[in-house]
């Protein structure tokens, strides 16, 4: 009987040790999930910050686009279709000629090509906005003097007109003159009527003006002496 009792005691000790070990392991196992949840929360916060910054950037871009749209007025002068023959066949593309201006002395034009008409217009608008130039005009809304613009085989004559005359022009010339802000001018096409060359010739003419101050500096005189 004594031998049997001695054999039972080691079993109780082993069970106590296993209980202690099993009691310690669950604590360790519970500690790791807490650390993981904390790291997950930190990652989610960082992702939320990134998403908020991206959304704010997109909002700023939309605001800038709205400003540019409200700032400039646009006119589509011509949309033409272009075909190109290759080994694989014919490829169709479209070109768009667009003029933009604020009717306050700033005007520009752009021409672009794309596979679709809307994309060609968007590209042309961006080019036109980047190529905006400041145009000189007097307080009556007309030119200071006669100008002759040239581009290729196109020649455009532009003259100042008295108030109330209006814009005597048509086609591509009218689009440029109107969006520049002129209200009374005479124009005449003296060459070929290719739209792109007419636009360039008109821009060449209205940007080659001399204001009274510039003439006074060239002649080394004051404005009163002129």
Curated annotation (Swiss-Prot):
Region annotated Disordered, chain positions: 1-71
Any Pfam family hit: Ribosomal_S5
Protein keywords: Ribonucleoprotein, Ribosomal protein, RNA-binding, rRNA-binding
Record flagged with keyword Phosphoprotein: no
GO CC terms: small ribosomal subunit
Tagged with keyword rRNA-binding: yes
Residue ranges annotated for the S5 DRBM domain, each copy included: 72-135
Notes on the domains: The N-terminal domain interacts with the head of the 30S subunit; the C-terminal domain interacts with the body and contacts protein S4. The interaction surface between S4 and S5 is involved in control of translational fidelity.
Family assignment from sequence similarity: Belongs to the universal ribosomal protein uS5 family.
NCBIfam families associated with the record: rpsE_bact
Name listed for the protein in its UniProt record: Small ribosomal subunit protein uS5
Protein's gene: rpsE
